[in-house]
Amino acid sequence: MLSSGQIRGARAILRLGQAELAEAADISLETVKRIESMEGELKIRLDTLTKIKTALERAGIEFIAENGGGAGVRLRKV
């Protein structure tokens, strides 16, 4: 499961604005803003989360699972 911090971090790495992420994920800008403002577990539809994750991964992001050190995000090595 992704966190709002991972989504914000991924956007920062890519230098991607909220509107650009919304367009890439085919969701509304208001949805991106709402999700990024959430604390704790994201309470959103699975298809919305999948759209965001897929858009960011296509742009080169790799999500890091929480393995004792905390969840994270990084640019995928090519």
Predicted regions: what is each one?
Residues I7-E20:
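Short basic helix-loop element that most often maps to the first helix and adjoining turn
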Residues Q18-S28:
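Short, composition-biased local secondary-structure segments
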Residues E39, L46-F63:
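DNA major-groove recognition helix of helix-turn-helix/homeodomain DNA-binding modules
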Residues M1-L2:
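A detector for short, charged/polar N-terminal pre-domain segments
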